[in-house]
């Protein structure tokens, strides 16, 4: 060393819990070779077996799959699923371990640290420790294990020699564990579940975890089952404040959804988040959006009260009225339009169209026609039935409550949620 500076200062990372200094420690890790897995997934994506809804994120997924490095799946943290890897203790004397015990047996190459609770943290290699401590005692208090890169291990326990083995303390990368969710939850559940539900029709998640969770599920799911775990991926964006800024506590612009529900209702929150949203794009939202959605739910209630009152006060007129045909054509077109938008996963656009048509056509025009005896009671009632069915995915609580209150006025089905999706405006209930 040519020169030292005793006044030199540097930054040292500290544990956020105990404030002990943290120092980088190069260690052997476990990896998955991803190139063969990625090539198989890419081949199926190219064949059209997967559709990504999300503003160009299909290209992002393709980029990740074609530029993958081997995947490090081992983590040196406590919380997680321990790697199913075992070492033969006597055959691996260079494995370093640290364990808790009530006993203190010092020796060459053994480090002992006393704790306030009367226990000791003992560290050393198995070769140095086993003459002083039993393997059972080491395993019972095991805190960490560091194996050399070339240490021999086994992946399946043998009951005959399990007492001579010690398990790896590393845990799986959380994305590796969660990547198995689509098939692991079905394979070990009720008989027939896997065959019926795998592959899933749609996965909905945020675009920010596309390369972490979605891609990992594709790699592992296809490797284990030979099939992609889902046929479509719908990616939503981040929810930002009304100025388009990311929400954070420091900025003070965080919207608490529970406060919104208490003030405007769960349906208002749901509709405000969905309307005019675009897959893969961030969405700005603010107080005005919640108010507008709340006003929509009020409008639905008012329309339902009108129809209920209509059935209480007026007699049925079976004669065609001037606006009947125009109304039927309009509602049939709306059913076709909304169904098509939902089939294309243009959910935000569907909500926007429904808001406009329910408010400005059904409430502002059709109800006025009915008041002026230009539209039959039967059709305005059927129109409300269809509107409730179309609006139900977006405002489920209000529409279901209204359906229950109106009863047979709008249909014989007990639940709106299980009623058949409308195909056209029929003239019978």
Please describe what each predicted stretch is.
Residues 225-227, 304-317, 407-411:
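Proline-centered turn/helix-capping motifs that create local helix->coil transitions or kinks
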Residues 64, 68, 73-75, 79-175, ...:
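Gly/Pro-rich turn-and-neighbor structural signature
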Residues 53-90, 120-125, 132-133, 169-176, ...:
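Structured ligand/cofactor/substrate-binding pocket environments in proteins
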Residues 71, 128-172, 180, 184, ...:
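Flexible, glycine/threonine-enriched loop-and-boundary segments that flank and lead into catalytic domains
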Residues 20-43, 161-189:
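Conserved oxyanion/phosphate-binding beta-strand-loop segments in alpha/beta enzyme cores
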Residues 1-96, 110-118, 125, 245, ...:
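Residue patterns forming the tRNA-binding/recognition surfaces of aminoacyl-tRNA synthetases
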């Amino acid at each position: 060393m040519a020169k030292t500076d005793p006044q030199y200062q540097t930054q040292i990372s500290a544990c956020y819990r105990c404030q002990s200094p943290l120092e980088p420690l190069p260690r052997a890790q476990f990896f998955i070779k991803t190139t063969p897995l990625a090539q198989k997934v890419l081949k199926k994506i190219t064949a059209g077996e997967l559709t990504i809804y999300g503003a160009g994120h299909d290209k992002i997924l393709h980029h990740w799959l074609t530029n993958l490095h081997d995947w490090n799946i081992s983590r040196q943290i406590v919380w997680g699923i321990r790697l199913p890897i075992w070492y033969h203790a006597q055959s691996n004397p260079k494995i370093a371990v640290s364990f808790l015990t009530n006993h203190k047996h010092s020796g060459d190459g053994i480090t002992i640290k006393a704790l306030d609770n009367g226990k000791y943290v003992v560290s050393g290699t198995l070769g140095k420790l086993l003459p002083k401590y039993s393997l059972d005692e080491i395993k019972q208090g095991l805190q960490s294990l560091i194996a050399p890169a070339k240490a021999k291990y086994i992946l399946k326990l043998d009951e005959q020699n399990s007492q001579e083995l010690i398990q790896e303390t590393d845990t799986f990368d959380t994305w590796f564990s969660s990547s198995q969710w689509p098939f692991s939850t079905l394979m070990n559940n009720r008989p027939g579940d896997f065959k019926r539900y795998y592959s899933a029709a749609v996965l909905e998640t945020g675009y920010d975890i596309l390369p972490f969770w979605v891609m990992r599920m594709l790699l592992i799911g296809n490797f284990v089952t030979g099939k992609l775990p889902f046929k479509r991926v719908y990616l939503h964006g981040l929810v930002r404040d009304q100025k388009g800024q990311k929400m954070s506590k420091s900025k003070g612009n965080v919207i608490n959804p529970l406060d919104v529900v208490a003030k405007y209702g769960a349906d208002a929150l749901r509709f405000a988040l969905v309307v005019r949203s675009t897959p893969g794009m961030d969405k700005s939202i603010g107080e005005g959006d919640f108010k507008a959605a709340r006003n929509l739910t009020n409008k639905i209630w008012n329309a339902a009260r009108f129809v209920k009152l209509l059935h209480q006060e007026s007699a049925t007129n079976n004669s065609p009225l001037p606006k009947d045909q125009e109304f039927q054509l309009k509602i049939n077109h709306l059913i076709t339009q909304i169904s098509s938008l939902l089939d294309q996963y243009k959910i935000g656009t569907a909500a926007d169209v429904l808001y406009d048509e329910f408010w400005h056509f059904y409430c502002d025009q059709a109800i006025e026609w009915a008041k002026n005896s230009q539209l039959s009671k039967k059709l305005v009632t059927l129109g409300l039935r269809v509107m409730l069915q179309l609006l139900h995915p977006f405002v489920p609580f209000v529409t279901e409550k209204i359906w229950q209150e109106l009863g047979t006025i709008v249909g014989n089905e007990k639940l709106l949620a299980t009623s058949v999706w409308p195909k056209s405006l029929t003239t019978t209930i």
